Amino acid sequence: MAAAAPAAAGEDGRRRLPGAALDIQPQEGAKVEAESGELERLRAELAGALAEMETMKAVAEVSESTKAEAVAAVQRQCQEEVASLQAILKDSISSYEAQITSLKQERQQQQQDCEEKERELGRLKQLLSRAHPLDSLEKQMEKAHEDSEKLREIVLPMEQEIEELKAKLLRAEELIQEIQRRPRHPPSLHGSTELLLSRDPSPPLEPLEELSEDGGPAAEAFAHNCDDSASISSFSLGGGASGRASLPRSRQGLSPEQEETASLVSTGTLVPEGIYLPPPGYQLVPDNQWEQLQLEGRQLQKDLESISRERDELQEGLRRSNEDCAKQMQVLLAQVQNSEQLLRTLQGTVSQAQERVQLQMAELANSHKCLSHEVKRLTEENQGLRAEQPSSSVPRVLEQDEGWEESLPSSLPELQQLVRRTQQEARARQQAQEHEAERLRIEIVTLREALDEETAARASLEGQLRVQREETEVLEASLCSLRMEMERVQEEQSKAKRQEVLRPSQGTGRTEEAQLTDLLSEQRAKMLRLQAELETSEQVQRDFVRLSQALQVRLERIRQAGSLEQVRGIIDEAPLRDVRDIKDT
């Protein structure tokens, strides 16, 4: 009995457990259906996102190609700017070197001019040094003039004294004649003569004493040079009896004219002894020659002053030119340093730009790789989800029910743990799906931005196409004008030919024909060149149109693709980077 009771209890427990499992099973089925519906919705959204992502991928490839072209254009522009700056620097350096050489040549020329002026100045100094004897001669003439003035001051009082002596001599002769007329009284004659001679014995010496007192060194020099002691003593009448006895004898047989001549001769013998004689090597010149020499000396002095001023001006000009040259050299060196600094800055900027471009290219390549991997992963997940998806929900529910019935635990705590674990897994899957959906939304926004950029690039290409069309229209108009000009030239040529037939002279016609032929050849060459330019522009326009049409067709095919394989096939086609790709495809 005891054994039967536990067996019955076990059977009752087993009966209750399927009942509880049957109660839990409808709830889990509803949850699974809701999750499966959400999963289907997410899968549909994922498929749409994948299709849009594939479209964006194609657009990204096109934008990448355009970006590469833009980067290449920027690099070419930077290289052209660097080359132009280097050419400008070379031109500026060559011009600066030419200026420096010209300044050096000017400086050498100024130095040569200064040397020539210095040589001319030395020559003039030599001439002036040769003219120095004129200055000494002038000084000597002035000294002689002063000596003559002093001599004149000495001679004039002596002439007055001589006149007084002559007067006294005349009176003495008159007295002698009176005495001779009276020979009876010899004693009285002697007494009268003594009386006459003793009447004023000192006056002849008074002027000499006064002269010696007043004249000073000049009188002593005159007395020393003239040595007139004997002459003056000859006029002295108070020297004793011998003088008194010889006077009548010396004057007895002379007439007044002879006495005057003798006195003048004696005076002439006195004066030349006091005249100043120049030292040896010098000569006395007349006044007109002296004035001429003075004029020449003043003229030479003026020339010397003008040359000195010119030398000072040249030295000042040379100093200023040296300062200007130094300043210009400093300015040129500063400009060269600034140019070198600018070149280094530009080189650094270009290198930085190249580094940034390389980094951007690397980032774009990495992002492209990441995007490719992500697309592949999403494609694999999508394929896996599609492969795991059952044909209908009923067999899936039955299979799940059978699996759950088989995997249901036998105890209640285990069943509760299973429910909690299932709920956690469902929440984890939901969070993962939310994260995946958010990531897909971000990727969709990014791809839309790239699509907008591509649209802007397309708009810019259309603008360039319009500009090219306008240029083509201008070229067509110029071609039409050239054709009209060609027709006009042909008409003129035909007229010229007709006139040439009418003209008698052939030389003029040949010349005009040659000129018209040259003009025609020039116009033909010009027309051919314009036709070639027009054809080139038309070809470029056609290429732009074909490229834009091909891109539009490919984008439209990507948008209209129904499956991921079609999008991958469109993407795997050859990239449209050039018109040759369109021709090849």
Curated annotation (Swiss-Prot):
Main subcellular localization, coarse class?
Answer: cytoplasm
Tell me where in this chain the PTM Phosphoserine is found: S188, S192, S198, S202
Q: Where is this region: Disordered?
A: 178-265, 381-408, 491-515
Instruction: Name a GO molecular-function annotation.
Output: GTPase activator activity
Q: Which residues carry this modification: N-acetylalanine?
A: A2
* Pfam families, A to Z: Rab5-bind, Rabaptin
Gene Ontology process terms (BP): cell projection organization; endocytosis; protein transport; regulation of cilium assembly
Alphabetized, the UniProt keywords read: Acetylation, Cell projection, Cilium biogenesis/degradation, Coiled coil, Cytoplasm, Cytoskeleton, Endocytosis, Endosome, Phosphoprotein, Protein transport, Transport
Residue spans making up a coiled coil are: 27-183, 288-540
Where does this one sit in the cell?
Cytoplasm; Early endosome; Cytoplasm, Cytoskeleton, Microtubule organizing center, Centrosome; Cytoplasm, Cytoskeleton, Cilium basal body
A GO term from the CC aspect:
cytosol
Q: Where is the signal peptide?
A: none
Q: Basic and acidic residues composition bias: which ranges?
A: 491-501
Domain of life of the organism encoding this protein: Eukaryota
Q: Quaternary state and partners of this protein?
A: Heterodimer with RABGEF1. The dimer binds RAB5A that has been activated by GTP-binding. Interacts with SDCCAG8; this interaction is important for ciliogenesis regulation. Interacts with RAB4; this interaction may mediate VEGFR2 cell surface expression.
Q: What function is annotated for this protein?
A: Plays a role in membrane trafficking and in homotypic early endosome fusion. Participates in arteriogenesis by regulating vascular endothelial growth factor receptor 2/VEGFR2 cell surface expression and endosomal trafficking. By interacting with SDCCAG8, localizes to centrosomes and plays a critical role in ciliogenesis.
- Similarity section: Belongs to the rabaptin family.
List the protein's name: Rab GTPase-binding effector protein 2
Could you tell me the gene encoding this protein?
A: RABEP2
